[in-house]
A protein has these predicted regions:
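Cyclophilin-like peptidyl-prolyl cis-trans isomerases
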Residues: 17-219
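Sec-dependent N-terminal signal peptides
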Residues: 4-13
């Protein structure tokens, strides 16, 4: 009996830990990305996990692609969209409260929530983007602090990341960052390099498929 109780307790502990540290496999025609969802943004993590479990994102498109900036997807209207149709206005009926964290910033590879222009900066319930960005110089970051960040200083450690790995610091503390690509950064570059139309939609569709990753494999 004691052994059984111990095993049940161990299983409960492991399950609880896994519920926090979630990874998602994103498959595309250009390769596969593995995304780690952050514990510091539980509302966004929970919502994203729910949608992945529901297969919400399967067959949706990366409908907005801007080289040296980001790749965006999650519009439910993109699933059966006609070629050339303008996308980006589809939603799933709710928003997620903003979860800004000073140590979660727009370095290359992060997963962040898209949103419309609302005073609370609440996130879309389904649309997201993955940052490609660019490498910045000190002079560019200095200018950005004055012109776009209202004088807010970029922390030294983050500044070094923007100068070496790159990203989109102009978006910091305006859009919720809630995950990070930990494998497959090259896939971002491949998708970002595709040819697009005047609305930044790829001329050739870039569909996605997502699955949760458990310790013992894909779920």
């Amino acid at each position: 009996m004691k052994r059984l109780l111990f095993l049940l307790l161990l299983l409960s502990t492991v399950t609880g830990a896994m519920a926090k540290h979630r990874k998602v496999k994103v498959s595309t025609p250009y390769g596969t990305m593995i995304i780690l969802l952050y514990d510091q943004t539980p509302l966004h993590r929970k919502n994203f996990v729910k949608l992945v479990k529901q297969h919400f994102y399967d067959s949706l498109l990366f409908h907005r692609v801007i080289n040296k900036f980001m790749i965006q997807g999650g519009d439910p209207e993109s699933k059966h969209a006609q070629p050339g149709a303008m996308l980006g206005n589809g939603e799933n009926g709710y928003t997620v409260p903003a979860e800004f964290q000073l140590d979660l910033y727009h370095r290359k590879g992060v997963l962040a929530a898209a949103r419309d222009d609302n005073p609370a900066r609440a996130s879309s319930g389904c649309q997201f983007y993955i940052v490609q960005g660019k490498v910045w110089t000190d002079a560019e970051l200095d200018k950005l602090e004055q012109t776009r960040l209202g004088g807010r200083k970029i922390p030294v450690d983050q500044r070094e990341i923007y100068k070496t790995i790159g990203g989109t610091p102009q978006l910091d503390q305006s859009y919720t960052v809630f995950g990070q690509v930990i494998k497959g950064l090259d896939v971002i570059d491949k998708i970002a390099a595709v040819k697009t139309d005047g609305n930044d939609r790829p001329l050739q569709d870039v569909p996605m498929k997502m699955k949760l990753i458990r310790k013992w494999g894909v779920f």
